[in-house]
Amino acid sequence: MEDVEARFAHLLQPIRDLTKNWEVDVAAQLGEYLEELDQICISFDEGKTTMNFIEAALLIQGSACVYSKKVEYLYSLVYQALDFISGKRRAKQLSSVQEDRANGVASSGVPQEAENEFLSLDDFPDSRTNVDLKNDQTPSEVLIIPLLPMALVAPDEMEKNNNPLYSRQGEVLASRKDFRMNTCVPHPRGAFMLEPEGMSPMEPAGVSPMPGTQKDTGRTEEQPMEVSVCRSPVPALGFSQEPGPSPEGPMPLGGGEDEDAEEAVELPEASAPKAALEPKESRSPQQSAALPRRYMLREREGAPEPASCVKETPDPWQSLDPFDSLESKPFKKGRPYSVPPCVEEALGQKRKRKGAAKLQDFHQWYLAAYADHADSRRLRRKGPSFADMEVLYWTHVKEQLETLRKLQRREVAEQWLRPAEEDHLEDSLEDLGAADDFLEPEEYMEPEGADPREAADLDAVPMSLSYEELVRRNVELFIATSQKFVQETELSQRIRDWEDTVQPLLQEQEQHVPFDIHTYGDQLVSRFPQLNEWCPFAELVAGQPAFEVCRSMLASLQLANDYTVEITQQPGLEMAVDTMSLRLLTHQRAHKRFQTYAAPSMAQP
């Protein structure tokens, strides 16, 4: 035992020092243990040869621990070597820079050879070198912070609240300005421009947006241009390619009150009607300064045009702007209609006494108010025009249509029995009473819930059929309807076969005698010829059914537990099959001994 503890001491108590782990030869110990495993023969020899699984587990765990410590030690050595090399090179470069600065030699004049630098293993450089500053060290580089492009400037919260995006539950998901496509300007070539860059999307490619500025470029550049603080967005849909009239030259700029009164630059006339519908978006001075300087010019305020000239006929086929705000239209009050009391009767109310005046039938009133039979075009009169009346109408039509179909089926059955009688559809309508005003043939409309297959079946039935044709038709109909039960029939057949197999077994088990382990133990003891004589178990249960053999086996185990019998078998794994033998030790049963048992203290003297 002491040899084993000394041998695996590093496994029981792991070595904390990384350098001492190199003294452990993991490969040699694993090889020795592998040889021991090869020599061990696992067999059924009553436990003489055993395998120590705890020792194997500790060996594997300890070997992995020692190997990981070796890897960790190598990792730390690599870090130390890299830090030493990089620190030495950094010190050499710093000293050379200071010498060049003291001598006044320009470092950029002589090309230096590019030296190999080691790749840093850390993502974050060591910040301790930037703590100590030297007095004679002056910053040689000036960090220039690049200006963020205007297209990437995040909009303000107030701008986001103007056009929010709601979900079905009413939650605010995002804003229109959160998506780049909504704020980009489409180019005539099909590209989305983050910034216009002097090109108006209303003009084709290669055309200058302001023709007048090309003539007087010198004067235009000399004059100061004002850029609007608020810029209207260009519509994303429905661009017109017709160039509008542009000013012939640069407009004279007004000052004083005109500059204070006008805070936005207007677009040319070609884009003014479409851009006027867009809400104006507020821009910061930084954003407005980044816009191109020749994009828009301030126009002179002209005389207002009359309303008749400005108003144009709207084009019904014009593409709409998905981000445009809809015009508010005045509310038009509809004309109310009262529903007759006999049309819709509420359930659950008390019965009221019928009035003396007989109200008109709803179907007749609806046809008189809704359809015009005299006119061939059947124009609608001033009648109900809302969905509730449609629902009531089609409900009434469905009821009459179902009644009509029942009468048709009854007539068809009577025609089969009495072929001499031939009635038409108009005769069946007389049985409905007031159903003469139902619908004319050209006005018949199949309701939504009607099944066209039923109507097809009624049309397919001839007026008179012979007996053979009728029988053949019924047989074909029965075969067609029984196709859907084929799968259920196969499943029921399998269930019936299973029940036929299981039911006899269940009935046989119900007929068996209830199992009593003491009763079967008494029967097994009575079969022994005498005491202390070995008798095979197969002879004791010879000629009995399988379930009786199982019960006798359980009873013999209980007898062996009570030391009434002794059980033995032949040695060997395969040779011991069906070699069970029993020997009766005593005829006295254990449960009977406990029933008649009396403690010595309770015995009478």
UniProtKB/Swiss-Prot annotation:
Keywords from the named record: Chromosome, DNA condensation, Nucleus, Phosphoprotein
Main location: nucleus
Gene Ontology BP terms: female meiosis chromosome separation; meiotic chromosome condensation; mitotic chromosome condensation; mitotic sister chromatid separation; positive regulation of chromosome condensation; positive regulation of chromosome segregation; positive regulation of chromosome separation; T cell differentiation in thymus
Record PTM Phosphoserine, positions in chain: 95, 200, 208, 228, 232, 282, 284, 466, 492
Keyword Nucleus found: yes
Modified residues (Phosphothreonine): 19
Compositional bias ranges of the Acidic residues kind: 256-266
Subcellular location: Nucleus; Chromosome
GO cellular component term of the entry, any: intercellular bridge
Highest taxon, organism lineage: Eukaryota
InterPro entries with a match to the protein in the record: CNDH2_C, H2_M, H2_N, Ncaph2
Region annotated Disordered, chain positions: 194-331
One Pfam family in the UniProt entry: CNDH2_M
Membrane-crossing residue ranges in chain numbering: none
Listed GO MF terms: chromatin binding
Record text on subunit structure and interactions: Component of the condensin-2 complex, which contains the SMC2 and SMC4 heterodimer, and three non SMC subunits, NCAPG2, NCAPH2 and NCAPD3 that probably regulate the complex.
Protein family per UniProt: Belongs to the CND2 H2 (condensin-2 subunit 2) family.
Cited function: Regulatory subunit of the condensin-2 complex, a complex that seems to provide chromosomes with an additional level of organization and rigidity and in establishing mitotic chromosome architecture. May promote the resolution of double-strand DNA catenanes (intertwines) between sister chromatids. Condensin-mediated compaction likely increases tension in catenated sister chromatids, providing directionality for type II topoisomerase-mediated strand exchanges toward chromatid decatenation. Required for decatenation of chromatin bridges at anaphase.
Protein's UniProt name: Condensin-2 complex subunit H2
